[in-house]
Amino acid sequence: MKTNIINTWHSFVNIPNVVVPAIEKEIRRMENGACSSFSDNDNGSLSEESENEDSLFRSNSYRRRGPSQREHYLPGTMALFNVNNSSNKDQDPKEKKKKKKEKKSKADDKKESKKDPEKKKKKEKEKEKKKEEKPKEKKEEEKKEVVVIDPSGNMYYNWLFCITLPVMYNWTMIIARACFDELQSDYLEYWLIFDYVSDVVYLADMFVRTRTGYLEQGLLVKDELKLIEKYKANLQFKLDVLSVIPTDLLYFKFGWNYPEIRLNRLLRISRMFEFFQRTETRTNYPNIFRISNLVMYIVIIIHWNACVYYSISKAIGFGNDTWVYPDVNDPEFGRLARKYVYSLYWSTLTLTTIGETPPPVLDSEYVFVVVDFLIGVLIFATIVGNIGSMISNMNAARAEFQSRVDAIKQYMNFRNVSKDMEKRVIKWFDYLWTNKKTVDEREVLRYLPDKLRAEIAINVHLDTLKKVRIFADCEAGLLVELVLKLQPQVYSPGDYICKKGDIGREMYIIKEGKLAVVADDGITQFVVLSDGSYFGEISILNIKGSKAGNRRTANIKSIGYSDLFCLSKDDLMEALTEYPDAKTMLEEKGRQILMKDGLLDINIANLGSDPKDLEEKVTRMEGSVDLLQTRFARILAEYESMQQKLKQRLTKVEKFLKPLIETEFSALEEPGGESEPTESLQG
């Protein structure tokens, strides 16, 4: 082991040079009382003494030295710690081991590099490969993550539209090609292309189903194995497998004129129904979509019935009687278009129960016509019922609105209201209906949870409320509370929103329309307020020292039809009870506004609390006390009823147990009664 000589300047004169060997060994020697390798002699004597002490330490034949001898080596230990420039106790044994390993690895690398430079190059290459493999592994892990389709998203809905097209194609064309031979033979190449494109879409749909997530405990499942297992456990998986069985191979046996071998493709109809259901919930015109959907179903049924009629006519023989399709050798009835249109016409007349068709002749024809009439009756009933309900739903809002108008008309006639006032009322109702303002927002939104209702109100009204000066810097929670309390109001031309001297119980925000600040004569206009303007915010705060009090200071009149948002004083104060800091801030803002306008009496504002405020607080306290009293009375009544029920139960238990106890006591009083129970127990 190499030792280094370090010149140190120490307070001890006898230590000009210090030899630093292995530090841990020296510490152990000093703890055991052995001589340290540090001494006052030169290097030769130091090494000799250390060798002697090593031999003594190994043979365990030395004795521990006393404290006087240990003091002799104290300067050496001090120098040792000064050389390290840190406390050995602060170093963790783990860190020491790590440093030793690093030193060993570096020493080994140096030795190997000197011996074999090729090995060094190999190791460097291996390290580079590992570095390159790490990003590759990360990329592979990212690739393994399955892309899951959200069933409520647009991507899934668009895919449903894509799969619906081949389903509708198969449901309409397979039966037509099977019944009309010319349709299959003349356009065979096109049909094969469409068929196999639809088969590819069917296969892709099976893959999409394995990547379509589902909700489990409110969370979208993205595990690939779970998605596949759920799809396989579903009945639709079996139907999907049956729908893609390659029955087209039977073409090689029967020929190309048998497209009915592809009837298994019709089993994928559930995807079409799913697409229609989702479209009905997404569209803004659900009633129109329902009617068009119903018409489509009826057309498909008529189409299928026409194809079956033509195939029955072909089986019986064209032109054999008056009921079947005429002879195809006739040029007029030999064209493909005439064949299909004639069959479709016959099917429509039969299924709509019009019945202006030639009567059947054969028994099979009679059976087919009877079945058609039964189907037609069901179709007719379905049409009448569905369309009737749709029309009633479409007109429900109008009927309800009209009933309100009729009720008000009857009331005005009963009270002999003037014709001018009646015209104004009717015009106001017409404006509401034409501008679609008859919807009661609270009634529509009452089925939604509070969170969703609040979010809708925030999206609709929050920007409008922030325009008001006093609410500009309020807390978000207070603004949400106030947004939920805004009430829409509509004023017709010439209506006064407020007049000078009226008590201010509401503030108003103009959503749409124009209002005019007019003189007492109602004609002279001072200012015109437009969209986004507001007024009455100071009066509902009821600020102490206001020269106007809580009364209106101007006449405000609607020029045309105006839509306003109204916030009442009671609603504001109810919201501010939960936000006392916001209340003080609003009052301070109101005072500043009044001071700018010169409408604040500072002397009154600096006085103590207003007795009116105290009265309001007292009334509120009385109201809360009344509520507590009613709750206490209700709880007391419940307690009394429960107590009465318990008494009744106890009396029933007493009645039941009393004869049993009497019989037991009578048995004990009789001679030998004590032995009878024991005997009975033993028996």
From Swiss-Prot:
It is a multi-pass membrane protein. SUPFAM superfamilies: cAMP-binding domain-like (SSF51206), Voltage-gated potassium channels (SSF81324). It is found in: Cell membrane. Residues 614-668 form a coiled coil. The record marks 380, 384 as: Central gate. Rod cells in the retina. Keywords: Calcium, Calcium channel, Calcium transport, cAMP, cAMP-binding, Cell membrane, cGMP, cGMP-binding, Coiled coil, Glycoprotein, Ion channel, Ion transport, Ligand-gated ion channel, Membrane, Nucleotide-binding, Sensory transduction, Sodium, Sodium channel, Sodium transport, Transmembrane, Transmembrane helix, Transport, Vision. Residues 1-160, 214-238, 282-288, 396-683 are cytoplasmic. The keyword tRNA-binding does not apply. Gene3D superfamilies: 1.10.287.70, 1.20.5.170, Helix hairpin bin (1.10.287.630), Jelly Rolls (2.60.120.10). Residues 183-192, 258-262, 313-335 are extracellular. It catalyses: Ca(2+)(in) = Ca(2+)(out); Na(+)(in) = Na(+)(out); K(+)(in) = K(+)(out); NH4(+)(in) = NH4(+)(out). Its main location: membrane. Residues 396-472 are annotated as: C-linker. 3',5'-cyclic AMP binds at residues 552-553. Residues 286-394 are annotated as: Ion conduction pathway. Residues 34-144 are annotated as: Disordered. Residues 353-356 are annotated as: Selectivity filter. CDD domains: CAP_ED (cd00038). Glycans are attached at residue 320. It comes from the Eukaryota. PROSITE patterns: CNMP_BINDING_1 (PS00888), CNMP_BINDING_2 (PS00889), CNMP_BINDING_3 (PS50042). One of its GO terms (biological process) is calcium ion transport. The C-terminal coiled-coil domain mediates homotrimerization of CNGA1 subunit. The cyclic nucleotide-binding domain (CNBD) comprises three helices and a beta-roll of eight beta-strands from CNGA1 and CNGB1 subunits. Upon cNMP binding transmits the conformational changes to the C-linker domain of the S6 helix to open the ion conduction pathway. Forms heterotetrameric channels composed of CNGA1 and CNGB1 subunits with 3:1 stoichiometry. May also form cyclic nucleotide-activated homotetrameric channels, that are efficiently activated by saturating cGMP, but poorly activated by saturating cAMP compared to the heterotetramer with CNGB1. The channel binds Ca(2+)-bound CALM1 via CaM1 and CaM2 regions of the CNGB1 subunit; this interaction modulates the affinity of the channel for cNMPs in response to intracellular Ca(2+) levels. This is Cyclic nucleotide-gated channel alpha-1.
